[in-house]
Amino acid sequence: IMGRHAYGDVYKNCEIEVKGAGKAELVFTYEDGTEERKTIMQMKGPGILQGIHNTEKSIESFARCSFRYALDEKVSVWFATKDTISKTYDGKFKEIFQRIFDEEFKAEFEKAGLEYFYTLIDDAVARVMKCEGNILWCCKNYDGDVMSDMVASAFGSLSMMTSVLVS
């Protein structure tokens, strides 16, 4: 079973194509007018930029829905990101999933004989190809889009895949 976060990432992104050299920055302006600013890159020529986002509230909701669904279906949860590269964005997903599990679901999972397992997305891809099932593999929006197609193709057919929106 694939669990795909249905908010944010590249599906609510902002992109620009730059025509020449310049400084690419990420800027956040708080309601009080103060700013956080980070240089992404000093572009030496034309290129492309993409900004993505997510909210803690949405990630928390995804985590809770995932753990509840897994308990209902009596399956363990795998969660995978690339937090070794995306330390802030993917790291926040990892942190929230772990906190929600520890504070709200750990006892229920132990009682049901189920597990929560975090790993890097690379490792999850390798593991899922050998997996006999009985898991809910949770991914961020884009990762879940791509990986659900891979799983459906490897274990049947894209045309046989079904989707259920859970909130």
Task: Say what each PLM segment does.
Residues I1-E36, I48, Y142-V146:
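N-terminal glycine-rich phosphate/adenylate-binding segment common to multiple enzyme folds
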Residues K12-E17, T88-F93, V128-C131, S148-A152:
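Short acidic, glycine/serine/threonine-rich loops at helix termini
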Residues L26-F28, G113-Y116, M160-S167:
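Short, acidic/small-residue loops that bind anionic groups at enzyme active sites
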Residues F28-D32, E36-I121:
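Glycine-rich phosphate/diphosphate-binding loop of Rossmann-like nucleotide-binding domains
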Residues V128-S167:
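Glycine-rich phosphate/nucleotide-binding loop
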Residues A124-A126:
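RNA-contacting regions in translation and RNA-metabolism proteins
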Residues I16-A24, F93-I100, A154-V164:
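A glycine- and small-aliphatic-rich helix-loop capping segment at beta-alpha/alpha-beta transitions
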